[in-house]
Amino acid sequence: MPKMKNNKGAAKRFKKTAGGIKYKHATKRHILTKRTTKNKRQLRPNSLLPRCEVAAVARMLPYA
């Protein structure tokens, strides 16, 4: 049986930790002048994936 492959896009975006699956918020790369300071601050911390989406991401990352 061939090896299963990780979804490369998901592998770059998600990291499996003991507490769950961690990800970074979107819209935080460039052209941030139109965003308020409050909005940029709220996007700063990494978040844990909601429980309803964990199974889908786990299927994309079989070796994580």
Swiss-Prot record:
Put simply, this protein is called Large ribosomal subunit protein bL35
Q: Which UniProt keywords apply?
A: Ribonucleoprotein, Ribosomal protein
The cross-references to SUPFAM superfamilies, in alphabetical order and at most eight, read:
L35p-like
Taken from the UniProt entry, a GO cellular component term is: cytosolic large ribosomal subunit
The record ties this protein, via Gene3D superfamilies, to: 4.10.410.60
HAMAP family in UniProt: Ribosomal_bL35 (MF_00514)
Give the family, as the similarity comment puts it. Answer: Belongs to the bacterial ribosomal protein bL35 family.
Q: Which organism is it from?
A: Vibrio vulnificus (strain YJ016)
Any GO MF annotation of the entry: structural constituent of ribosome
Q: Which GO terms describe its biological process?
A: translation
Q: Which domain of life is it from?
A: Bacteria
